[in-house]
């Protein structure tokens, strides 16, 4: 199963800790505490008692030790988090059934947050030693419904998966309920549907065939709510949505000419009108980010400390054009820059099923074209979008 696949992190694989974006606190879950020494190079983890895997085996320090050592031994660095663990961890030591000490190669104040706390989609997945100990981690699929695989510590188990839906059923013997840590979740069955484009999601939600959905426009939300009063947003009034922790961006491949020239990339940034993107693509449900950092209250001191690096929400097309022309490009009769017989172009890839990213891409294309760059926007499938980003198969991509 994919570590980021639909529902696995929410239902099956529980984290040690969870970052609460509203309070800026790191809350404990399977982990009871993870504290550092004064030098920040020795971290001590204490696991909550009574945690069990879904097959009844106890979750202990042995599972943590086994997982970390597996990642440290991965010479290919192809396993999730193996490169990070090899960068930071010198060794791990078991100190009792529920305690592990991490000895780091150098101080890391973010060790707990970066690797053992859920921030968005998930965190490091801890492996059950009693199943994985005699398996080859590079080939073992960990999927066999007859054996109940995959297992986790979560309150649900995977019961079926297909191209269009993933189904989980509640485990009434979940450790959290048995130990009194948390009550059983209300839903007895959770279904993740692959809905495709926004129109499909909106129709399903309006007909009460979806209980939760994401990535829809303001117009679509208001239409759904007019048809189905049970649909609510995070906030009762504009801007309705909770601010995502990842500001959106246009990533430009700096290995492809002429965009390998930082002055040319700076020109793009100057030409982009971020305020217009918010108005058109987001229908004023967001605001331009000043930096690459999300503007949560806890981040304010850091953002205020770099005011000299704040990004202007309005465009400066003339300054952008000056940078382009200083690199030898001349505006042609068709309105686009040319040099040595070639037009200045930029192809922008977007996620076909992500209406938000597509709309942002559309606005950027028009802004760049108006300034003399022959920009195009190509919507591709999510799997291709992810692969192209990972392997640099793009000129530019709207992402985060």
Segments from the language model and where they lie:
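Surface-exposed binding/hinge segments that line
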Residues: 46, 82-135, 157, 273-276
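Aromatic- and charge-enriched surface segment that lines or borders ligand/interaction sites
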Residues: 32-78, 95, 101, 110-111, ...
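Ligand-site clamp/hinge motif
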Residues: 48, 144, 174-225, 360-366, ...
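A structural "hinge/loop" feature
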Residues: 1-9, 29-30, 57, 111-124, ...
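N-terminal lobe/hinge region of extracytoplasmic solute-binding protein
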Residues: 1-38, 69, 151
């Amino acid at each position: 199963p994919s570590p980021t696949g639909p529902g696995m992190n929410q239902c099956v694989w529980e984290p040690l800790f969870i970052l609460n974006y509203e309070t800026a606190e790191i809350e404990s879950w399977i982990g009871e505490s993870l504290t550092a020494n004064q030098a920040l190079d020795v971290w001590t983890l204490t696991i909550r008692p009574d945690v069990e895997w879904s097959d009844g085996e106890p979750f202990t320090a042995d599972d943590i030790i086994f997982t970390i050592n597996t990642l440290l031994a991965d010479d290919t660095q192809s396993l999730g988090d193996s490169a990070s663990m090899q960068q930071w961890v010198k060794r791990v030591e078991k100190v009792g059934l529920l305690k592990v000490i991490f000895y780091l190669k150098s101080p890391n104040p973010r060790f707990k947050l970066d690797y053992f706390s859920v921030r968005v989609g998930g965190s490091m997945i801890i492996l059950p030693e009693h199943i994985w100990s005699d398996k080859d981690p590079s080939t073992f699929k960990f999927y066999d419904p007859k054996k109940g695989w995959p297992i986790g510590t979560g309150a649900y188990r995977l019961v079926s998966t297909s191209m269009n839906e993933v189904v989980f059923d509640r485990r009434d013997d979940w450790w959290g309920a048995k130990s009194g840590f948390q009550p059983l979740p209300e839903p007895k069955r959770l279904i993740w549907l692959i809905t495709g484009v926004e129109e499909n999601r909106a129709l399903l939600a309006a007909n009460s065939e979806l209980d939760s959905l994401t990535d829809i426009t303001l117009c679509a939300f208001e239409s759904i709510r007019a048809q189905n009063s049970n649909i609510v947003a995070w906030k009762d009034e504009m801007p309705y949505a909770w601010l995502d922790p990842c500001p959106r961006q246009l990533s430009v491949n700096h290995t492809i000419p002429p965009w390998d020239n930082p002055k040319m990339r700076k020109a793009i940034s100057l030409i982009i009108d971020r305020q217009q993107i918010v108005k058109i693509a987001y229908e004023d449900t967001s605001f331009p980010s000043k930096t690459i950092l999300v503007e949560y209250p806890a981040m304010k001191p850091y953002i205020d400390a770099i005011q000299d690096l704040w990004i202007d929400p309005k465009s400066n097309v003339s300054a952008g054009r000056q940078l382009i022309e200083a690199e030898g490009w001349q505006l042609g009769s068709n309105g686009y820059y040319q040099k040595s017989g070639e037009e200045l172009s930029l192809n922008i890839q977007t996620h076909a099923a992500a209406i938000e990213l597509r709309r942002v891409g559309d606005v950027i294309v028009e802004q760049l074209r108006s300034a003399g760059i022959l920009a195009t926007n190509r919507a591709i499938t999510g799997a291709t979008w992810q692969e192209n980003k990972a392997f640099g198969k793009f000129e530019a991509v709207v992402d985060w």
